[in-house]
């Protein structure tokens, strides 16, 4: 993947501005509410009966924050995202058996939450760079499935 200077700067800027403990949990909770079939991977997380239970679940919050911090690895290794996530791809495909389409669903929810947090600063150009970044991450996480 080729990154422009604008894209690199934009991705770093986004991750320097967002609140991980807010955005991560909100994105994961949104994914679980909007796409309820994704809840099957979180059976050990307790009550996911409705939106209120999901958004108030401390395990969902913690995992959402963990996911967002996991994206830091891609931000720091933008030229080698595929290898950066090689082990995580194996874990999700061979151990957790996560449907790789769910990575895209989560990335869409993350885009919505980040847009809400950044407001007018989340221009079309910024969104394009962010979605390109997330598409590379999603592809890398799904790599083991191919």
From Swiss-Prot:
CDD domains: Hb-beta-like (cd08925)
GO molecular function, one term: organic acid binding
Domain Globin positions: 2-146
Tissue expression pattern: Red blood cells.
Gene Ontology BP terms: hydrogen peroxide catabolic process; oxygen transport
CC terms in the record's Gene Ontology section: blood microparticle; haptoglobin-hemoglobin complex; hemoglobin complex
Keyword Electron transport: no
Keyword match Calcium: no
Subunit and partners: Hb2 is a heterotetramer of two alpha chains and two beta-2 chains.
Protein name, as recorded: Hemoglobin subunit beta-2
Species lineage: Eukaryota, Metazoa, Chordata, Craniata, Vertebrata
